[in-house]
Amino acid sequence: MEADFVIIGSGSAGSAMAYRLSEDGRYSVIVIEYGVPDVGPLIQMPAALSFPMNMETYDWGFSTEPEPHIGGRSLVTPRGKVLGGSSSINGMVYVRGHARDYDHWSESGARGWAYADVLPYFKRMENSSGGQEGWRGTNGPLYIQRGKRDNPLFHAFVEAGHEAGFEVTEDYNGEKQEGFGPMEQTIHNGRRWSAANAYLKPALKRPNVKLVKGLARKIVLEGKRAVGVEIEAGRSFSTIRARREVIIAASSINSPKLLMLSGIGPAAQLKEHGIEVVADRPGVGQNLQDHLEVYIQQECTQPITLYSKLNLFSKAKIGAEWLFFKTGDGATNHFESAAFLRSKAGVEYPDIQYHFLPVAIRYDGKAAAQSHGFQAHVGPMRSKSRGSVTLRSANPREKPVIKFNYMSHEDDWADFRHCVRLTREIFGQAAFNPYRGAEIQPGAHVQSDDEIDNFIKEHVESAFHPCGTCKMGAVDDPMAVVDAECRVIGVEGLRVADSSIFPRITNGNLNGPSIMVGEKASDHILGRTPLARSDQEPWINPRWQVSDR
């Protein structure tokens, strides 16, 4: 079996590349996917989002090694093992990231990935409803919507931010990210609008695209050129040949793992596992980054939250309405208000993100208290902590060793203390007076730095945004894995294009930026001239040097 291009992974970037590389019919594409089909309400119903990421059917089941700076806790690292990859199990929140994130990419060695370069690709991929005119795409495959925001708590959150002196923004994905405003969702006609729905399924209707189920074991190399992929399907092994290129889009966990299994990575580590070294790239698996967050929860004095919908009868009613009509409480992820804020004067652009929910709920989807409540998910966006993904063995079926080194930089603790206190300030504004009850978490007794630190150590969780393990950079950067056209340095015919190539984590959720990577990488792979650079300038708070708001 062979094709012009062989893509490993049907996730956010992989699906986009399958669509674009096959678009004009000149080239054949094979997509290798180990996961299951994305069928059923647990995947497609937006409100069911807490289920697929906690089910081994749809998730690779990764977790970290015990993290020493948060009391030895091991945190889960969900990655989608399903058509659409993590875009089929995520929270459906759409965030481009801030313009300065991409300017930093370019300045750090990823030339051609500044905001002016990537904005045209965001526009090409978007089909935005309600976004800022002139800044958003309206004809792309990826549908983006805003929720109805029919719960008054969503508006109280935004008004409270305004009362506290912060900016308000009507479109954080437009000219102005900073401020409080509506959150955007990858939902269309009441369904999760994953990369599979947006890109892969339309591509699979073309005669030049084929989906192959199997586990990618290693890249097949002839000398220093990639010529195919060895896969395992059932108990049989086979090789899929690539006439032109192999493209890895297997996630920030599996992409570096696959490179290392193929002899591309830190030489000493490869030799330790008996793997022949093809290219000594010490950066493979390094530079691992993520966003962490905590939940700040309040009781609500009015019975207007989703707490009343958590009983079995209400869930059945919600499910039935969604199954028959794709409407109602099942047709939203319930993340409908958000904020991007700067932590202090001297910070040029937002470094704190908020998701607001009109319910107080735990990570497993159960009520945090036997009462009505609401909560904010809050965390810093640019932690200095860095981790790694390394091989546990040379067995492709064995999970890698994942160490994020969460909270290992002293700034992380100060940042999170500020997040907790800032959220209390926001919840204490007059806009919440009609609704605010007692604080559920951390609790009113948690006040001092030590008390807040202990709360963080026990309760901080991943926002599930791992990235950076195959860093894009200049070819003379010893820690770069791919160049600015996503080509693996030192190997021909091989690229990586997914969130693993991010030099630094972007400001917000990563599905949107990962799809953008797939879009832009496609033009590089096809040898096309990149889309014309944008001359639009993002809004930067004129008071950023003297005020945090």
Curated annotation (Swiss-Prot):
Source domain of life: Bacteria
Entry's Gene Ontology BP terms: glycine betaine biosynthetic process from choline
Pathway(s) the chain acts in: Amine and polyamine biosynthesis; betaine biosynthesis via choline pathway; betaine aldehyde from choline (cytochrome c reductase route): step 1/1
Active-site feature positions: 465
Keywords of this entry: FAD, Flavoprotein, NAD, Oxidoreductase
Enzyme's top EC category: oxidoreductase
SUPFAM superfamilies for the chain: FAD-linked reductases, C-terminal domain, FAD/NAD(P)-binding domain
Described purpose of this protein according to its UniProt entry: Involved in the biosynthesis of the osmoprotectant glycine betaine. Catalyzes the oxidation of choline to betaine aldehyde and betaine aldehyde to glycine betaine at the same rate.
Protein name listed in UniProt: Oxygen-dependent choline dehydrogenase
Species the sequence originates in: Brucella anthropi (strain ATCC 49188 / DSM 6882 / CCUG 24695 / JCM 21032 / LMG 3331 / NBRC 15819 / NCTC 12168 / Alc 37)
Encoding gene, per UniProt annotation: betA
